[in-house]
Swiss-Prot record:
Entry protein name: Phosphate import ATP-binding protein PstB 1
UniProt-listed Enzyme Commission number(s): 7.3.2.1
Chain's gene name: pstB1
Domain of life: Bacteria
Similarity field: Belongs to the ABC transporter superfamily. Phosphate importer (TC 3.A.1.7) family.
Length: 258
């Protein structure tokens, strides 16, 4: 079931470095929120904070609140593994397990949870591949290695793997940056379908992509080199691209910088 994410006064640090300052925003269920901004502005850092992936970096810490519905994912006693199960991640480059079969790639997360029933695994593999619009392309070669698929197919395989564990939220970090235009179109069409079931947050440098796939857009920027990234503005995507409140947003959208 899709859930809402709320960030309140979030500050992100790596050791003594203040990476992102004072971010407050609401990410609505069954919608796509795009995070945009120049390189180094903190948008990917914010994305990784939403499921505690940044914690793999030594010295990383977060101040403020990140709520999944009403549950603070940083509260004492909250298991990061459980958070990452509820809030899945699709990375910039497709990262299937190359020697593992297509079927086993999809159900890898379920197996880690201890699921061994073959029918459950097979049914989940099929439903997830259908959900990722990949089933018809691979149904006759499920036992072939996932690494043998094209780049676009591999990314959809990674999306199938993410939704197999039934998350509430899907995070996507520039999911089309390494793909050709045809594969990019397939992923964008898939995102539009997936938002009917999931809350989706996507980081993208492609302004046209943000305009096409998202319902709301958040623009991040840096005050200066060495200063923390900040949320400049968040609004409906239509407003951000047609009549933003902040000049910095307009300048970035129009290509004057970034």
């Amino acid at each position: 079931m899709a859930k809402r994410l709320d960030l309140t006064d979030v500050n992100i640090y790596y050791g003594s470095f203040h990476a992102v300052a004072d971010v407050s925003l609401a990410i609505l269920p069954r919608s796509v929120t795009a995070l945009i901004g120049p390189s180094g502005c903190g948008k990917t850092t914010v994305l990784r904070t939403l499921n505690r992936m940044h914690e793999v970096i030594p010295g990383a810490r977060v101040e403020g609140a990140v709520l999944l519905d009403d549950q603070d994912i940083y509260a004492p006693g909250i298991d990061p593994v459980g958070v990452r199960r509820a809030i899945g991640m699709v990375f910039q480059r497709p990262n299937p397990f190359p020697a593992m079969s297509i079927r086993n790639n999809v159900v890898a997360g379920l197996k880690l949870q201890g699921v061994r029933n073959r029918k459950v695994l097979d049914d989940t593999a099929e439903s997830s591949l259908r959900g990722a619009n990949l089933w018809d392309e691979v149904k006759d070669r499920l036992d072939k290695p996932g690494g043998g698929l094209s780049g676009g197919q591999q990314q959809r395989l990674c999306i199938a793997r993410a939704i197999a564990v039934q998350p509430d939220v899907l995070l996507m970090d520039e999911p089309c940056s390494s793909l050709d235009p045809i594969s990019t179109m397939a992923i964008e069409d898939l995102i539009s379908e997936l938002k009917q079931q999931y809350t989706i947050v996507i980081v993208t440098h492609n302004m046209q992509q943000a305009a096409r796939v998202s319902d709301q857009t958040a623009f991040f920027n840096l005050e200066a080199v060495g200063k923390p990234g900040r949320l400049v503005e968040i609004a409906s995507t239509e407003k951000i691209f047609s009549n933003p409140n902040q000049k910095a947003t307009e300048d970035y959208i129009s290509g004057r910088f970034g």
